[in-house]
């Protein structure tokens, strides 16, 4: 019994700790970009050319894509949830997963999130 418990803990604990570290690093990266005007500018350009160019708009309009600059988020509202939604998409919707298919990979996606955050109201 004791060996089984030790084995279980030694297998599960590293996975849990790894996942906790990933989320923390990712959120701090988005926060870092929010204080960098060049990163926010690049995020805006990427948003306009990728997201707003096809579905999402910079102003609330009657389109079938969600408006992203308010506090009403349907598919998660944390930075990590937004990252996951853009990366994997939303099943049974037009929101396809982009993966990390941006010129600078994940960094560009975090810059898009920083742009959205800096142009949205403070949500509780």
What kind of feature is each model-predicted range?
Residues 43, 47-58, 112-116:
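The canonical Cys-X-X-Cys-His
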């Amino acid at each position: 019994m004791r060996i089984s418990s030790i084995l279980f803990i030694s297998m599960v604990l590293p996975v849990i700790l790894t996942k906790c570290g990933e989320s923390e690093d990712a959120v701090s990266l988005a926060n870092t970009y929010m204080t960098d005007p060049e990163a926010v500018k690049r995020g805006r350009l990427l948003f306009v050319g990728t997201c707003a160019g096809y579905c999402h708009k910079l102003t609330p309009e009657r389109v079938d894509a969600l408006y992203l600059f308010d506090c009403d988020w349907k598919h998660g509202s944390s930075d990590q949830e937004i990252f996951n939604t853009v990366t994997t998409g939303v099943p049974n919707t037009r929101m396809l997963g982009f993966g990390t298919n941006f010129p600078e990979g994940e960094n560009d996606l975090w810059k898009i999130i920083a742009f959205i955050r800096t142009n949205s109201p403070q949500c509780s």
